[in-house]
Amino acid sequence: MKKYLSFLLMAAVACFVMCGCDSRKSEDKQTVKEFKIMTDFEIAKSKAKINNKPVLLVFSGSDWCGWCVKLDREVFSTPEFKDWAADNVIMVIADFPAVKKLSPELVAQNEKLKNTYGIEGFPTVLLLDSDGNVIAQTGYQHGGAANYIAHLKSLMK
């Protein structure tokens, strides 16, 4: 009987510990600011004008360009970058995938943007004012999110 009670007590303690761990994880997830990468350039420019922020326009080949995948994985997908970007830029991706299908409207918009800004290689990252004028042009940078944020800050001055 004592062994049975001891086992029950240990099982109850384990359940409480596991429940406590899960709640801390969800609290951590809530600390990341809301961040959304947009695809509609005109809406992004309007949002940039309203919020007085520059537009970060990323030209990418998300499913075939190795440097694009690396930039997304090392920078754009990190909580550090998402937190910074949520406060400082309106981010838009003009994607040119090989396999993934985009709507005809999105394909047309991305082609028009590529031609308008004279994009010849991927990834190309443009920092624009809210009217769509180029402030700076860059691409992949070594060093992860912290280095990329510092690089973008230097371009925004």
What are these regions (language model features)?
Residues V17-G20:
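C-terminal motif of bacterial Sec signal peptides marking the signal peptidase cleavage site
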Residues I37-M38, F81-V107:
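Thiol-based oxidoreductase modules, predominantly thioredoxin-like and allied folds used
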Residues S23-V32:
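Bacterial Sec signal peptide processing site at the extreme N-terminus
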Residues N51-C65:
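Short active-site neighborhood of thiol/selenol oxidoreductases, capturing the structured segment around
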